[in-house]
Amino acid sequence: MFCIQCEQTIRTPAGNGCSYSQGMCGKLAETSDLQDLLIYVLQGVSAYAVKAREFDIIDHEIDTFVPKAFFATLTNVNFDDARLVEYVEQANAYRGRLQDAYETACTAKGVTPEQMSAPAQLILATSKPEMITQAAQAAPNRGDVHEDILGLRLLCLYGLKGAAAYMEHARVLSQTNDEVAGQFHEIMAFLGEDSVDVDKLFATSMEIGQLNYKVMAMLDEGETESFGHPEPTQVNTVAVKGKAILVSGHDMVDLELILKQTEGKGINVFTHGEMLPALAYPEFKKYPHLVGNYGSAWQNQQKEFANFPGAVVMTSNCIIDPNVGSYADRIFTRSIVGWPGVTHLVGDDFTPVIEKALALDGFIYDEIPHLITIGFARNALMAAAPAVIDNVKNGSIKHFFLVGGCDGDKAERSYFTDIATQAPDDSVILTLGCGKYKFNKLEFGDINGIPRLLDIGQCNDSYSAIQLAIALSEAFECEINELPLSIVLSWFEQKAIVVLLTLLSLGVKNIRTGPTPPAFLTPNLLKILEDKFGLRNTTTVEEDLKTILNVA
């Protein structure tokens, strides 16, 4: 086992990364090894997908499968070895299918098939124990490679994982694109070649950022076409009397299915975590039994799910051990999510969830409502832009802070609460992702009717923030980096990595990240990123605010 992809990975003077028998996320060594093998086989699939495309052979089923299966290897997504073995075997079958198609096309054209990369040539083991042994050749730190090269490879690999997750979210909303899929395969295949070319690896990281910008646009289009444009909405965040289902993850389509299937059954539906933004979409306001948001970010689920008196559905990341809070018998997984012993739902029938919710007590009384305001996504931001611009011009708004990303449980993450609460009263705070839960229930007031706290949405709604920044830069006839805008990104896993790469690929500079730098980035790489982009780690709130606001 070697895993260094998330913020909670082990860091010691002897070296960084989770190894031995179990990772800090709870992932067992065998599970980690199977994920490595899955990635390796997927790189082989992509290698053949690239070659097949040279003959105009595009297999949409495979284009769908590869990013979805890759998504299963993100932090806190799939811990179920049996499901991972199925993914590995399916990937191997798809690789064989593309290989046959490619070689047949070569024969028809009278050309010799090219020599393929090691992942494309792998002869897959036939049993789980043999696969785990075989996984050694698929480990991300395989071979004798300089730590800077390894760090760049991992930056690309983990960034592409984040993009794969967003591709799957977009696909669920019927948003696919052959060009995007082709570019994804090219990068995936390249990473399977174990390049030692620093310039090529760095350029690839920027290419991943550009790819993800396209994917976020697709996802934005899919969500708004399906559910309308989010609009400023007040949301209740406490218990409502009645039977209950809690929906966590990111999948709006699953939420819609659950709402339709629970109509008239006396069940209240709550969102959790990154599903909170759903409550701002017009289409979801048709359902009076979608009553609010319960709980906070992913790392608190073992307490929050244990206290929730109903059924829980995990539509995507993040899941952590449900046995700790003794709710494994009433949590259900969907799509790429998996935990051993937890009921996994295949297809669109949520009857088991409904039956479980009806059998449980539900909330026995209403709590006094606590309302927060959400829904400041792209359309709402664009509508507010003229008023925002006027307030900047008249001096009422002097600075913008974008504070968001992934949440986590380290004590140092109080930084993100403090920078939001200590930001000057003449500043506006934009937030997105589950990092918002560090401060989204606090009161920030308004500036001439413009709320000081604007909740943009999910982590992928970084796209909305980028559109606002572009609109402001055009209005003020300046570059984005010349705007009074400071980005403070809380990172935990691979989606945050690809959002960062997206911003860097667009030329956005002087971003602060925290609470700690990614362990896979060496001091040399961090210095390069600082020199090239002004990327830096958070320090103290007081020092960072002085620097941001140019206070002597």
From Swiss-Prot:
HAMAP family: Hydroxylam_reduct
PTM sites of type Cysteine persulfide: 406
Signal peptide: none
Name the record gives this protein: Hydroxylamine reductase
Function: Catalyzes the reduction of hydroxylamine to form NH(3) and H(2)O.
Main location: cytoplasm
Record PANTHER family: HYDROXYLAMINE REDUCTASE
GO MF annotation terms: 2 iron, 2 sulfur cluster binding; hydroxylamine reductase activity; metal ion binding; peroxidase activity
Binding site for hybrid [4Fe-2O-2S] cluster: 250, 274, 318, 406, 434, 459, 493, 495
The keyword Transmembrane is assigned to this record: no
Gene assigned in the entry: hcp
GO terms for cellular component: cytoplasm
Keywords, in A-Z order: 2Fe-2S, Cytoplasm, Iron, Iron-sulfur, Metal-binding, Oxidoreductase
Protein localization: Cytoplasm
EC number of this enzyme: 1.7.99.1
Positions contributing to [2Fe-2S] cluster binding: 3, 6, 18, 25
Single GO biological process annotation from the record: response to hydrogen peroxide
Cofactor: record remark: Binds 1 [2Fe-2S] cluster. Binds 1 hybrid [4Fe-2O-2S] cluster.
Family named by the database record: Belongs to the HCP family.
Required co-factors: [2Fe-2S] cluster; hybrid [4Fe-2O-2S] cluster
Source organism: Shewanella sediminis (strain HAW-EB3)
InterPro entries in alphabetical order: HCP/CODH, Hydroxylam_reduct, Prismane-like_a/b-sand, Prismane-like_sf, Prismane_a-bundle
One Pfam family named in its UniProt record: Prismane
Catalytic reactions of this protein: A + NH4(+) + H2O = hydroxylamine + AH2 + H(+)
